[in-house]
Amino acid sequence: MAEKVLVTGGAGYIGSHTVLELLEAGYSPMVIDNFHNAIRGGGSMPESLRRVQDLTGRSVEFEEMDILDQAALQRLFKKHSFMAVIHFAGLKAVGESVQKPLDYYRVNLTGTIQLLEIMRAHGVKNLVFSSSATVYGNPQYLPLDEAHPTGGCTNPYGKSKFFIEEMIRDLCQADKAWNAVLLRYFNPIGAHASGCIGEDPQGIPNNLMPYVSQVAIGRREVLNVFGNDYDTEDGTGVRDYIHVVDLAKGHIAALRKLKEQCGCRIYNLGTGTGYSVLQMVQAMEKASGKKIPYKVVARREGDVAACYANPSLALKELGWSAALGLDRMCEDLWRWQKQNPSGFGTQA
């Protein structure tokens, strides 16, 4: 019998790619999502997961649910026996978090506390949590390793991830039956090689690469580059971009780690290489064969100049490392964008 894994927020960008990898690895994923960042496909299924089913030839169990809905979560845990939970659900826009801090704390913190309480009540004490490199705040040194101080976060989104990390650490400390792997993501981009699933931001993209690809396809006129006066090679912000498929595979490695009764473990998921905004624009121009017009505007509140990972601990302890390079990230992103000019709303 395939081990059942609950995936919260599993219809979103990273979630759907992880569900696909779970299926390929022989797990049985059960997905809950509230459609905050997903588009409905046929019936009650999110379009992203409908396509995952098509790609894998396997079925995905799905229930529409909000992690703030305690009664629904209780029913779910009564009905199913989960080996582990992969927790993606939450709000995730840095800029919006500065504007709406209470929303971020309510959904991310309260939602996670409720989930952990229900997991505990049902004896499900294995967790993979999607954290973020934003917990490091302004880097004191680069590359960032897991020992770098956390908590100096520059926005409520990052703070919410930091608080959740601390809660999970305390929980594992208090009850040795808990095992948790906290994955600090750097900047996931790209799409599945089929071009059938990818990142489909609702409204104006907050992240660089979906915006760049929408400019390339003609959905948007010009890219805004937030600041060119940073202390970096070309003055634009530097980030560690990682292929979403590599990132998704990191979650499979994390599930394996839980089997070792690992307690609380924390890993960076990044490539170890930083690229600037303008380097990413050039890489996307190369992949798409399109010119990408841009204009420089003011810096964005809460953005740091440069941020990239030291991913060596994940290699050592999880046997995981990023395999797909920048060209591949951009080619896969462009294939997704070209095949789906309107994202998941594109009619086949």
UniProtKB/Swiss-Prot annotation:
Entry keywords, A to Z: Carbohydrate metabolism, Galactose metabolism, Isomerase, NAD
Keyword Protease on entry: no
Top-level enzyme category: isomerase
One GO term (biological process): galactose catabolic process via UDP-galactose, Leloir pathway
Catalytic reaction annotation: UDP-alpha-D-glucose = UDP-alpha-D-galactose; UDP-N-acetyl-alpha-D-glucosamine = UDP-N-acetyl-alpha-D-galactosamine
Cofactor: NAD(+)
Annotated positions binding NAD(+): 12-14, 33-37, 66-67, 88, 92, 161, 185
Residues of the signal peptide: none
Catalytic site positions: 157 (proton acceptor)
Record has Transmembrane helix as a keyword: no
EC number: 5.1.3.2, 5.1.3.7
InterPro entries xrefs: NAD(P)-bd_dom, NAD(P)-bd_dom_sf, UDP_G4E
GO CC annotations, alphabetized: cytosol
Subunit structure: Homodimer.
Family: Belongs to the NAD(P)-dependent epimerase/dehydratase family.
Protein name: UDP-glucose 4-epimerase
Organism of origin: Bos taurus
Gene name for this UniProt entry: GALE
